[in-house]
Amino acid sequence: MNFILIPYLCKNLTIMTREETVLNYLREHNIPFTNYNHPEGKTIEEARRWWKDDGSVHCKNLFFRNHKGNKHYLVCFDCDHDLAIHDLEARLKESLISKGLPSCGKLSFASPERMMRYLGLEPGSVSPFGLINDTEHHVHLFLDENLRNASSLSFHPNDCRGTVVISHDDFERYLKEVGNTYEYITLY
């Protein structure tokens, strides 16, 4: 299936790229960040070539759906770690059930269509900044507990040709502004 990407419109009706949408959102909410552009890096392996040695924890972001397809989860963790989906399912279930919420059930990667519908993104550009597009707050964000210890984090600005570096405290401010539910859990 082919997608027709429709550029975002900002308040003054000018066309903005996905990256500009993220950067403008952060500026409008007075959230400090640094940004740099580089050649396309759709995978961690590709992007590593272009990342600067800025001291940030570069994050891997995976988008899942439950077996019924009615719940969606974005999972973020340090890109230097790997996760088996079965282990991830167990940890997410444990976290949800401990809060009295229904289990996530069996997880699978969300399709590109679902990614576009809920985050406005394509594979290779997923990041927590996609939550800007989730105006109904459908997606729940799981962050690895170890990210709390990072002084700064880095993510794609919804475009795999750039990197945004943001302090952990300012990332927390972003999450409160965007309004989706989120929690920290131990993933590894």
Kindly give the residue locations of the regions a language model identified:
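Extended, low-hydrophobicity, polar/charged segments
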Residues: 3-188
